[in-house]
C-alpha cells in the first residue's frame, strides 16, 4: 500500500455514517468463553442442530472467520473511507472506539443487524446480558466502515455490487465520554 492510500481513521468526523458487514459467525475471538459455555455450563451436544442453526453445533463453532479485503477494495474505489474496524475480541465496545478521534462517539442502532442464532444460544445457555454480549462478540457484524453522510448511498451500492449485505448501523456524533453507545443497552 502506498503511504498516501493508508486508511488511518484520522478522517472520521461528526456526521459520518457507520456501515456494517455481516460476520460469518463467532469468528476467531471469544473462544475461551464459548468453550466454557458449551462444555461446562450448557454441556451442549456438538452433533445436534439446535433451533436457529442450519448445521450441527460443532460445524457452526468451526465456521471460518470472514476476510473483508474484497469489500475494502470495492468500497475504496467508489468513496473515501474515513475509518474502518474489524469487530474482534472485545466486541463493539472495544473495537469501534479505536477508530474514533477524541471528542466524538459512535451511536449504534442494532435493529437492522441479522444476529446469527449461535449468539442467542450462547446468551441463553450462559445467561449473559445483552450489553456483555456486545462487549465480547461481534453479534453478527464483522466489519464496520465510516464514510461521509453524502457518500452513504454510493457506499451501500458499491458494497452490494461486491456481493455484500451492508447495513447502516448509526452515525458519528460530537461528545465526550463513552466512544460507543448502543441504543437500548
Kindly give the residue locations of the regions a language model identified.
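Short, compositionally biased
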Residues: 31-42
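Glycine-/charge-enriched secondary-structure boundary and capping motifs
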Residues: 44-47, 51-185
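Glycine-rich anion-binding loops of enzyme active sites
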Residues: 1-31, 171, 183-185
Amino acid at each position: 500500500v502506498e503511504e498516501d492510500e493508508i486508511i488511518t481513521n484520522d478522517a472520521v468526523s461528526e456526521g459520518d455514517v457507520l456501515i456494517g458487514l455481516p460476520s460469518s459467525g463467532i469468528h476467531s475471538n471469544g473462544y475461551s468463553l464459548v468453550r466454557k459455555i458449551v462444555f461446562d455450563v450448557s454441556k451442549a451436544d456438538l452433533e445436534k442442530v439446535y433451533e436457529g442453526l442450519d448445521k450441527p453445533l460443532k460445524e457452526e463453532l468451526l465456521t471460518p472467520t470472514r476476510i473483508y479485503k474484497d469489500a475494502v477494495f470495492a468500497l475504496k474505489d467508489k468513496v473515501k473511507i474515513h475509518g474502518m474496524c474489524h469487530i474482534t475480541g472485545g466486541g463493539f465496545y472495544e473495537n469501534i472506539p479505536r477508530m474514533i478521534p477524541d471528542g466524538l462517539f459512535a451511536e449504534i442502532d442494532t435493529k437492522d443487524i441479522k444476529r446469527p442464532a449461535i449468539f442467542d444460544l450462547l446468551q441463553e445457555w450462559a445467561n449473559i446480558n445483552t450489553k456483555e454480549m456486545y462487549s465480547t462478540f461481534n453479534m453478527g457484524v464483522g466489519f464496520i466502515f465510516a464514510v461521509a453522510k453524502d457518500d452513504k448511498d454510493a457506499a451501500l451500492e458499491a458494497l452490494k455490487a461486491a456481493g455484500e449485505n451492508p447495513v447502516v448501523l448509526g452515525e458519528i456524533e460530537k461528545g465526550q465520554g463513552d466512544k460507543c453507545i448502543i441504543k437500548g443497552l
